[in-house]
Amino acid sequence: MANDAMALMKYLKIKKAHLVGASMGGLIAQTIALNSPEIVSSLTLMVTSPGIRDERLSKPDPIFLDGMTESALMMIKNNQKEAMLKTFKASIGTRFSYDDLVIEELFNIVDDHGTNTYAFHSKAIEKTPSYLDKLKDIKIPTLVINGSEDPLIPIDHAFALSEGITESKLYVMEGVGHELPEELINEISS
């Protein structure tokens, strides 16, 4: 996916860009920053990790993992909608509440991409190496943003990113989980 993003930049004749990546997008942005730093002017890494499977970093919250397991079983029973809604509700944090209509809209957006979305997403993350020991090589101004209640990417991942990238700043959003609701747009963009 990093190669796809770089190919798109080349096609659009974008020589240098500010990269913003959330979750897996943050892993993609790190990959680009490490492999082609000359095309990156700055980074914003949101709710992401330098190595989701790195043993030196905290694992996802067991309650969230239980929800993912239950969701996987629901998907096997061909109930992807209920599975996604359950996972989403487990990952939002306590600062904001979501009504079922908003969650339903999000499901419809994801569902438009096909039934194997979660499987492909998980496979891609599984194949991404840990960048924890390479963060020092990122010499690009970076903003790291994470929720204090992210059950998938615990807060120590954000601290690791911020401490590993010398030109970085960390912004922690209190009470926010892995999902970034619309109400945070102004806070994040400022």
Regions found by a protein language model. Give the residues of each.
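Flexible "cap/lid" loop of the alpha/beta hydrolase fold
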Residues: 41-75
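Short beta-strand/loop motif that positions the catalytic acidic residue
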Residues: 138, 144-146, 150
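Short glycine-enriched nucleophile-adjacent loop
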Residues: 26-37, 43
